[in-house]
Amino acid sequence: MYGQPQKKIEGKEKKNFFTNCSISSISTEGRLMAINDKYLVIPWQKPGYINIVDSNNPTNLLQNNNIFKTENSNILDMEFSPFNSNILALCSENNSVILSYISEEITNFNQSNCYKSHKNKVSFVNFNPIVSNLMCSSTSYGEIHIWDSSKMKPIIEFRLSSPNSIFWNPNGSMIGISTKNKFFYIFDPRQEKYIFNQQISHTMSTSKFAWLDNGSIATIGWNSNGNKYLYLYDIKRNEKPYSSILIDKYTSPTVPFVDQEMKLIYSVGKEESYINVYDYSLEGLKKCSNFICTETNHFSLLLDRKYLDKNSQEVDRLVRFTKTKNIYLFVFAIKIKTLNLNKWLIQMKT
């Protein structure tokens, strides 16, 4: 990245975003909340219940009355549709995926359809980012389905031992899967086979991943000495990572979040208070900034860029569920620190 502007990321924590988050006591690798430009949804107190609030109106969640029962079992993962902000997918220990519609004023929560083809509790669910009726879901036992939400029928079924995260790539043509045995796989539905697999960690700690683009991924793993690294892989070359950078020596699970437009990676550790920010390119990784939060992180989500405040200089928003049962917002802004400015301007002109 010689001669190019060096990114300087600034961050500010907004406390009391949502308070008294009495989340249900479940053990899951899935997402403990879902948020978009309209709503925040969390599994609430009892198995099968959810709390829905206006995501633009911070409040004490114990004072909210929009609590709905979805079913009788624990909710293990949830995601909003990228095509309709009112549609929410929930998966549960009841071996099913529920598609629901939230009314504009949160007066109704209608369960429109239910996918019931899994034989075990469903741990993960994801909307395809391009095809509105295409979805994937997985059980913790490795039963993975690609299915049509308009017909509620499976299209492709395959198995993989102990998934702990599963996501479509940005153009919706492949599925990435990380597993509890520290491997990462990419499945191509068109060929109905795995086209990539690598061991990404050498310790007992499990790893998760994020897509950088359609041909590369970021993942966090531990080397044989127990050091935690951020790795970048090119899936066209089924070999060692093309770039890596040391994060720390802690053993806590850490999740990478990627902003593909700004070429930034955020690493956020569970039960830690640190946020590290990295700039990435084809030439490799470079650390931009690091932040210490006031409260320990339990779970986080990176808000989609289309939901950012267009009138501000913010580039990303990280939504954090803390150990004290509060939901805080961490807002990032960018400053460009230019090295060799004249040389860089000449390069841009040519």
Regions found by a protein language model. Name each.
Residues 1-61, 288, 307-350:
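Acidic and/or Ser/Thr-rich intrinsically disordered tails and linkers
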